């Protein structure tokens, strides 16, 4: 995680929001009586595998192209070592899901170590933890097998182990190894698997679905990278929407995300061509998403395919009777998640290692069906899926993938929600501040995706604009139930969308927290359960605010969307002390990236005089006053 540092262009005094006396400042008076309820799960995460945020990102498996998956397999990331060559072998399948394996052809006069290497996803992050590797091998061989992690350019070894293994040409056998490592200075590390060339000379060996894991979050098998999971945990989000997003839709009905192909052993998962230009291994599958929720204390929000592929791909949308097999598939998925072991799919879940049903309460039907030709048919499709799911699971909250009335049934079913997405310019987000004041309050809202766009990195102007937008929906969080910034994660080496909340490379600890990350963290970690009335002698703009309470604690969130300092008095009867957290920079274009960290929050303890706090808010600033 990036350490706190001084902000450029703002003095340390301003950073700490030094107390000032200014009779002409803006006055905010927070009522301690009454108020509207605020959703307890307001802030959370939207995740799909974009920007190698899953494979190569938060998913712990580090080898790229581990199983040569897909109908057009290739040797991306693989290379030969020593007196040998490698090739794709489609005649020695590992399983029906993994029809191709790597054939290692060893020279007749081979000596020394021969084998194969994998470069990972633009490197391998060796962090000094214990590593675990597994692989399948077929071919007549009895001898040493060595697994090493070695510097790509330096040859420095960061960890290794050697085992003795016997395999035959008849069947694949699996081997697993564990070994300690020392921390590498960067991600330029290769995975190397070798056999004794003098023993294997003149023969060939096949290798299938190789894996490499370091320590995982909460030691989950096939789990998450702790470095990224910890950063998310620091935000204290409340929910996780998965698996997308566009990556749920796919480019055709056949290419959609298929839940039943993401479960079981890794060698039984065929993977799929993802929507964001690269193949998904689906090692991060249905079980792993629910364990992610369990381990970070998140409410799962499951997206299901609803007969519409991205941009009407593959002759979708499907309607009428053509939807029946896909509705049945969703019902099977829900039985897998929620059914006890007396049910067909609940028993299958238990056989895959999860005896107890998961606690799923929310399902979203489709993704952005207002786009790409989906709107006209969505009312029919939503109703068909809603009716079937609600009949079988009446307690589930079902969410429409759009809030646009033209795409929805004339009357939404009681208890259903709608999903509102907003990617916009900074001024566009600020312009939406009042949008949520005027909602039909009988239909709850999920803001499933939002952020500033059309820039490489979140900057202060955009992050303050997002804060204004967030203040707008938090003021209305009796009807706005959940909201998530998107996209969440970004491997710097392979990016399909910017800006993103959190960036990283494969160098250990190389994580870049954006200005927008800090806004999300500040707002999520400081939440009340009741939104309080605030009276002021000023209109909204350029200063925006919202106040909430939880018991005797009060939270006032502020955003200064402008270039002038704002002097403030904030009155909260009965309070005496508070903590001020501020993110600010006088340059609206200031940003954090992989090459610089210019803007981080600062905190100070402040005292009230008769329940009144007096301070100044710098230009282009987001602040939270937590008082009691």
Curated annotation (Swiss-Prot):
One of its GO terms (molecular function) is alpha-L-arabinofuranosidase activity. Acts only on small linear 1,5-alpha-linked L-arabinofuranosyl oligosaccharides. Residues 1-25 form the signal peptide. Belongs to the glycosyl hydrolase 51 family. Keywords: Glycoprotein, Glycosidase, Hydrolase, Signal. Glycans are attached at residues 36, 51, 74, 152, 171, 260, 359, 440, 493, 610. It holds the Pfam family Alpha-L-AF_C. GO terms for biological process: arabinan catabolic process; L-arabinose metabolic process. This is Alpha-L-arabinofuranosidase A. Its EC number is 3.2.1.55. It catalyses: Hydrolysis of terminal non-reducing alpha-L-arabinofuranoside residues in alpha-L-arabinosides. Pathway: Glycan metabolism; L-arabinan degradation.
């Amino acid at each position: 995680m990036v350490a706190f540092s001084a902000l450029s262009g703002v003095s340390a005094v301003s950073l700490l929001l030094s107390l000032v006396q200014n009779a002409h400042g803006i006055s905010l008076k927070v009522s301690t009586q009454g108020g509207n309820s605020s959703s307890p799960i307001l802030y959370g995460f939207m995740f799909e595998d974009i920007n190698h945020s899953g494979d190569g990102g938060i998913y712990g498996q580090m080898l790229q192209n581990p199983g040569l998956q897909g109908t057009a397999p290739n040797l991306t990331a693989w290379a030969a070592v020593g007196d040998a060559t490698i090739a794709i072998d489609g005649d020695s399948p590992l399983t029906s899901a993994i029809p191709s394996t790597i054939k290692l052809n060893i020279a007749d006069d081979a000596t020394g170590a021969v084998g194969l290497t994998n470069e990972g996803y633009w490197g391998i992050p060796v962090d000094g933890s214990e590593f675990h590797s597994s692989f399948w091998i077929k071919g007549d061989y009895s001898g040493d097998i060595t697994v090493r992690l070695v510097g790509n350019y330096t040859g420095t070894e960061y960890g290794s182990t050697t085992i003795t293994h016997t395999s035959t040409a008849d069947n694949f056998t699996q081997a697993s190894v564990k070994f300690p490592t020392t921390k590498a200075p960067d991600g330029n590390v290769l995975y190397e698997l070798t056999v004794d060339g003098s023993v294997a000379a003149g023969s060939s060996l096949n290798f299938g679905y190789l894996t490499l894991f370091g320590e995982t979050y909460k030691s989950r098998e096939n789990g998450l990278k702790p470095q990224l999971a910890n950063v998310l945990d620091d935000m204290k989000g409340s929910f996780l929407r998965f698996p997308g997003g566009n990556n749920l839709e796919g480019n055709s009905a056949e290419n959609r995300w298929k839940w039943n192909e993401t479960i079981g052993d890794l060698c039984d998962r065929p993977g799929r061509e993802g929507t964001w230009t690269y193949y998904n291994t689906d090692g991060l599958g249905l079980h792993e998403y629910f364990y992610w929720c369990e381990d970070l204390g998140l409410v799962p929000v499951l997206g299901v395919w609803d007969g519409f592929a991205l941009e009407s791909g593959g002759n979708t949308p499907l309607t009428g009777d053509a939807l029946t097999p896909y509705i049945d598939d969703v019902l099977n998925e829900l039985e897998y998640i929620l059914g006890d072991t007396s049910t067909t799919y609940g028993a299958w879940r238990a056989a895959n290692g999860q005896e107890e049903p998961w606690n799923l309460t929310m399902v979203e039907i489709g993704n952005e069906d207002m786009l790409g030709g989906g709107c006209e048919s969505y009312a029919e499709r939503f109703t068909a899926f809603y009716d079937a799911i609600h009949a079988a699971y009446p307690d589930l909250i079902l969410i429409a993938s759009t809030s646009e009335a033209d795409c929805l049934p004339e009357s939404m079913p009681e208890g259903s929600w709608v999903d509102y997405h907003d990617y916009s310019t900074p001024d566009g987000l600020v312009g939406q501040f009042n949008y949520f004041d005027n909602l039909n309050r009988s239909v709850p809202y999920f803001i499933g995706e939002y952020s500033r766009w059309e820039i490489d990195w979140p900057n202060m102007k955009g992050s303050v604009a997002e804060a204004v937008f967030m203040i707008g929906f938090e003021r209305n969080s009796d009807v706005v139930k959940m909201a998530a910034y998107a996209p969440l994660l970004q491997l710097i080496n392979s990016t399909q969308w910017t800006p993103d909340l959190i960036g990283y490379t494969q160098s250990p600890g190389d994580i870049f927290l954006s200005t927008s990350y800090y806004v999300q963290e500040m707002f999520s970690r400081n939440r009340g359960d009741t939104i309080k009335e605030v009276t002021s002698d000023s209109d909204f703009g350029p200063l925006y605010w919202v106040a909430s309470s939880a018991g005797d604690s009060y939270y006032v969130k502020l955003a200064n969307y402008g270039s002038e300092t704002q002097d403030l008095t904030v009155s909260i009867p009965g309070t005496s002390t508070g903590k001020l957290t501020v993110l600010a920079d006088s340059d609206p274009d200031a940003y954090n990236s992989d090459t610089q960290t210019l803007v981080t929050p600062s905190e100070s303890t402040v005292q009230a005089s008769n329940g009144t706090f007096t301070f100044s808010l710098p230009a282009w600033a987001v602040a939270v006053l937590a008082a009691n």
